[in-house]
């Protein structure tokens, strides 16, 4: 007697194939979702490491600004003033050497990848600080300096020449540094103000700086950008520097939740990132801000000292 052989019916086979397809699709979706989560976490890590840690490196030197200045009340005419606004912040012996050079803080000092909500391009700021070195050390470019010299550091945005195919301009926050001796008439690096410096924070679309200022009675405090402070006739004194950065991830994300027209608030400035039609991959961006109190600026307490090699 022949044994009957049972097999799949056509309907059972179709159901099995359908279930297999569903399971495979679910596994594929989990894999894609996991990859996106990994990319998002990596992008966040990029911003945390380059942004927050880099900002900490910068603020360490900014806190030294105004060290051994002619007056602890930091103003735009303070000799050896920690935030360099005008030629009067340099000693008389240096003023001819710095005249006409890019060695001053400015609200429109360098390039950016942003515009305001009305579609007008906005430049990034430039911050120049100086302080007297109390000990031998290294400046923001990693170059050694000697105790007793005045150290000058310039923070600005520039393009990363080693970048690949990236959206807009691959900008980063760089620092260029030099020094001068007390009573000297030139920087140790005569090209200071035109060099490329050392990149500190990669992929910064916008750099903005505000100054916390007050009058001599310390009853009016406000924030001004550098150019408005420079043009203010009341010669307010500077108490703190507020820094704002729009930092982006190094790599793009496969996410549709990131809008190209998103507005970012960087201190008192609303900005929108310039769009690049050649790049379809979105990037994660984050605003990083920090206020640095200038410990050597006296916070409104005048304590004039004799400036060696001054006016």
Give short role names for the model-derived ranges.
Residues 41, 54-244, 250-284, 289, ...:
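N-terminal pilin/flagellin-like segments and related low-complexity appendage regions
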Residues 2-67, 303:
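Aliphatic-rich helix starts adjacent to a transmembrane/signal segment
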């Amino acid at each position: 007697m022949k044994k009957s052989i049972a097999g799949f019916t056509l309907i059972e086979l179709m159901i099995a194939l359908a279930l297999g397809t569903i399971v495979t699709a679910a596994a594929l979706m989990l894999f894609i979702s996991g990859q996106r989560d990994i990319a998002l976490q990596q992008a966040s890590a990029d911003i945390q490491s380059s942004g927050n840690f880099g900002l900490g490196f910068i603020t360490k030197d900014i806190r030294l600004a105004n060290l051994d200045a002619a007056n602890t009340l930091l103003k735009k005419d303070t000799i050896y003033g920690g935030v360099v606004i005008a030629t009067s912040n340099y000693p008389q012996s240096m003023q001819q050497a710095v005249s006409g050079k890019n060695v001053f803080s400015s609200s429109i000092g360098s390039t950016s990848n942003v515009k305001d909500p009305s579609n007008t391009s906005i430049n990034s700021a430039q911050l120049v600080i100086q302080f007297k070195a109390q000990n031998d050390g290294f400046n923001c470019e990693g170059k050694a300096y000697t105790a007793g010299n005045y150290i000058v550091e310039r923070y600005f945005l520039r393009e990363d020449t080693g970048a690949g195919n990236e959206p807009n301009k691959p900008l980063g926050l760089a620092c260029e540094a030099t020094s001068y001796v007390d009573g000297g008439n030139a920087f140790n690096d005569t090209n200071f103000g035109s060099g490329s410096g050392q990149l500190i924070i990669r992929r910064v679309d916008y750099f903005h700086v505000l100054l916390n200022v007050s009058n001599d009675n310390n009853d009016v405090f406000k924030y001004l950008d550098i150019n408005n402070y420079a043009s203010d006739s009341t010669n307010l004194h500077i108490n703190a520097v507020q820094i704002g950065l729009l930092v982006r991830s190094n790599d793009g994300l496969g996410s549709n939740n990131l809008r190209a027209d998103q507005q970012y608030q960087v201190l008192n400035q609303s900005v929108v990132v310039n769009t690049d039609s050649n790049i379809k991959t979105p990037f994660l961006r984050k605003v990083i801000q920090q206020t640095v109190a200038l410990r050597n600026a006296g916070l409104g307490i005048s304590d004039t000292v004799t400036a060696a090699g001054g006016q």
